[in-house]
Amino acid sequence: MAIVKCKPTSPGRRHVVKVVNPELHKGKPFAPLLEKNSKTGGRNNNGRITTRHIGGGHKQQYRLIDFKRNKDGIPAVVERLEYDPNRSANIALVLYKDGERRYILAAKGLKAGDQIQSGVDAAIKAGNTLPMRNIPVGSTVHNVEMKPGKGGQLARSAGAYVQIVARDGAYVTLRLRSGEMRKIPADCRATLGEVGNAEHMLRVLGKAGAARWRGVRPTVRGTAMNPVDHPHGGGEGRNFGKHPVTPWGVQTKGKKTRSNKRTDKFIVRRRSKK
């Protein structure tokens, strides 16, 4: 893994910082594990914008990732690491002993030729997946399930991890990167180690066009709009003279948005404020 700072041969190259990984596969992805990935432009079925700042971008194919890791007792070997345009983490193509191939999230340190396994009998090493009741307290894990058999939901992006801090009966307590402490059923699975490609956070796109290649459109300030477009719009000066709100008039800057009260009982400690 190398961090490459481009020379300022043009204004668009001046600030570019790339993350180069020579271990990534340079050919085409494994075709049977690809699916069509249609772009929405941030619109719903009525044609209305439901998510702002989305549109354009390069065509992409979705890689079917195995978040469940449920082929117990069958060893697999890592064939190669690949780039995935749909996520910040890299992915690994693994070949199981029964001949099946699957994509998984590439754990930190995982490389071609490594052996991995899933199930209660799997060894305690990075890339292996076990129920959390079988993982030692203090271990760092990723791709963590929140319901048994549902597939990993927590800690899936580049460099992400969760730490197991306690085990109490049918639940384990996890410390998330946000500082939140949360109880999860001990039968839920997790993959040992951190997600790889942690250097992803160091990259600098360098120009607006690089964001457009990724399907990200500009973010316009509310104060730069007209009153018809945003509550902050209009006026002669730059001061909008009211509490900051979203384009729909909902208070922003610190307003709580969590509505899933049903699972509040599993949160031991709220996330720490920045």
UniProtKB/Swiss-Prot annotation:
**PROSITE patterns, alphabetically?**
RIBOSOMAL_L2 (PS00467)
Q: Name one GO biological process term.
A: cytoplasmic translation
Output the Gene Ontology cellular-component terms: large ribosomal subunit
**Region Disordered: start and end of each range?**
28-54, 221-274
Q: Which domain of life is it from?
A: Bacteria
Alphabetic keyword roster: Ribonucleoprotein, Ribosomal protein, RNA-binding, rRNA-binding
Kindly give the HAMAP family that the UniProt entry links to this protein. Ribosomal_uL2_B
Instruction: Name the PANTHER family for this protein.
Output: LARGE RIBOSOMAL SUBUNIT PROTEIN UL2M (PTHR13691:SF5), RIBOSOMAL PROTEIN L2 (PTHR13691)
The family annotation for this protein states: Belongs to the universal ribosomal protein uL2 family.
Subunit info here reads: Part of the 50S ribosomal subunit. Forms a bridge to the 30S subunit in the 70S ribosome.
What's the protein called, per UniProt?
Large ribosomal subunit protein uL2
Which species expresses this protein natively? Edwardsiella ictaluri (strain 93-146)
